[in-house]
Swiss-Prot record:
Zinc finger residue extent: C2H2-type: 82-104, 110-132, 138-161, 364-386, 392-416
One Gene Ontology MF term: chromatin binding
Quaternary organization: Self-associates. Interacts with other family members; IKZF1, IKZF2, IKZF3 and IKZF4.
Miscellaneous note of the record: 'Pegasus' was the winged horse in Greek mythology.
Entry remark concerning the domains of this protein: The N-terminal zinc fingers are involved in sequence-specific DNA binding and heterotypic associations with other family members.
A Gene Ontology biological process term: regulation of transcription by RNA polymerase II
Gene name per UniProt: IKZF5
Disulfide bonds listed in the record: none
Protein name: Zinc finger protein Pegasus
Keyword list, A-Z: DNA-binding, Isopeptide bond, Metal-binding, Nucleus, Repeat, Repressor, Transcription, Transcription regulation, Ubl conjugation, Zinc, Zinc-finger
Low complexity bias: start-end ranges: 289-311
Length: 419
């Protein structure tokens, strides 16, 4: 019977060692500094229990599933977080929990030595001290606004620029690069009806925007090789800094782009200097196409009948130079950017690869403006602008134009005053 007496001592000792190991493990996870002190205290208590026999210290252990065990005077949950005694808030570190408890107790230990300001959070005091020093480390990337608090900067972005930061893990852009993209898109709103096409002869160049490099993996329909081939012909790549040179990204803006080009052409009654020189006014039909319809449009434009005289096809231009390029009509000279047959008695050049013959009706033609459209939607929008009785009368405001150039300039200005 006397040999069974040490069993309670062994049980208490083993249980205390278990509590010591668990406490030390939890303190390492939470980053608490006082874990070593409690481990030493529990080990000392275990030694005293061995010396005093059955008079071991009482260990308070809570078996409630919602509360966990008591550590550092705070209840700890089973996932290792410290729990607030006033509410259900839980934190991994004691510093955060102490700051939270000050909300309940009303304690404000962080005081300003220049004014009566006091706060329960040290970071709030640091932001307050910037009001005395005048320091404004936070700057808006879209304008010259600066402030001393990050929350004021976020409020400024939402109120002034109507921008909300993108949340989630879908975007792989950094914050500075994302705000740079938003800045470019904001400038597009003010100049959306301006043209990007450069009218300097002999080629028309469309530069590639910088932000397309970041979103190419999300928009597979955009063919970046065409932009890159055109960007090589320009002195500088990327989006131009001039806000007047912006990308045309929808059918309405493409119509405005065409009208802006026609408005800059010389008058219709201008005579050419020589029979071999054709004025740029005869380069009137323009191809309005989208990147997804490039293959169909190029095949159709190459198969259109131009003249009854024998002609030889010119070499096919690079794929990237066909965007927004003039397409020769039934009575116009072939352009440098198309693969249409050449007029006159010219020597045969290197033949282009044979293209599949497509139905010419796929290319929509406006007989009033002598323009060709590869997109049915764009063609419908354009034809809806013509009047029923007078084709050069605006169908929106009723303004009567002289000719197709005046009609195109009227829609480029966008001033539809009801008469």
């Amino acid at each position: 019977m006397g040999e069974k007496k040490p069993e309670p001592l062994d049980f208490v000792k083993d249980f205390q060692e278990y509590l010591t190991q668990q406490t030390h493990h939890v303190n390492m996870i939470s980053g608490s500094v006082s874990g070593d002190k409690e481990a030493e205290a529990l080990q000392g208590a275990g030694t005293d229990g061995d010396q005093n026999g059955l008079d071991h210290p009482s260990v308070e252990v809570s078996l409630d599933e919602n509360s966990g065990m008591l550590v550092d005077g705070f209840e700890r949950t089973f996932d290792g977080k410290l729990k607030c005694r006033y509410c259900n808030y839980a934190s991994k570190g004691t510093a955060r929990l102490i700051e939270h408890i000050r909300i309940h107790t009303g304690e404000k230990p962080h005081r300003c030595h220049l004014c009566p300001f006091a706060s329960a959070y040290e970071r709030h005091l640091e932001a307050h001290m910037r009001s005395h020093t005048g320091e404004k480390p936070y700057k808006c990337e879209l304008c010259s606004f600066r402030c001393s608090d990050r929350s004021n900067l976020s409020h400024h972005r939402r109120r002034k620029h109507k921008m909300v930061p993108i949340k989630g893990t879908r975007s792989s852009l950094s914050s500075k690069k994302m705000w740079g993209v938003l800045q470019k898109k904001t400038s597009n709103l003010n100049y959306s009806r301006r043209a990007l096409i450069n009218l300097s002869p002999p080629s028309m160049v469309v530069q590639k925007p910088d932000y397309l490099n970041d979103f190419t993996h999300e928009i597979p329909n955009i063919q970046t090789d065409s932009y890159e081939s055109m960007a090589k012909t320009t002195p500088t790549g990327g989006l131009p800094r001039d806000p007047q040179e912006l990308m045309v990204d929808n059918p309405l803006n493409q119509l405005s782009t065409l009208a802006g080009q026609l408005s800059s052409l010389p008058p219709e009654n201008q005579n050419p200097a020589s029979p071999d020189v054709v004025p740029c006014a005869e380069e009137k039909p323009f191809m309005m196409q989208q990147p997804s319809a490039q293959a169909v449009v190029s095949a159709v434009s190459a198969s259109l009948p131009q003249s009854s005289s024998p002609a030889s096809p010119e070499p096919r231009p690079p794929h990237g130079q066909r965007n927004y390029s003039p397409v020769a009509g039934p009575s116009s000279e072939p352009s440098a950017h198309t693969s249409t047959p050449s007029m006159g008695n010219s020597q045969p050049s290197t033949p282009a690869p044979t293209l599949p013959v497509q139905d010419p009706q796929l290319l929509h033609h406006c007989q009033h403006c002598d323009m060709y459209f590869a997109d049915n939607i764009l063609y419908t929008i354009h034809m809806g602008c013509h009047g029923y009785e007078n084709p050069f009368q605006c169908n929106i405001c009723g303004c009567k134009c002289k000719n197709k150039y005046d009609f195109a300039c009227h829609f480029a200005r966008g001033q539809h005053n009801q008469h």
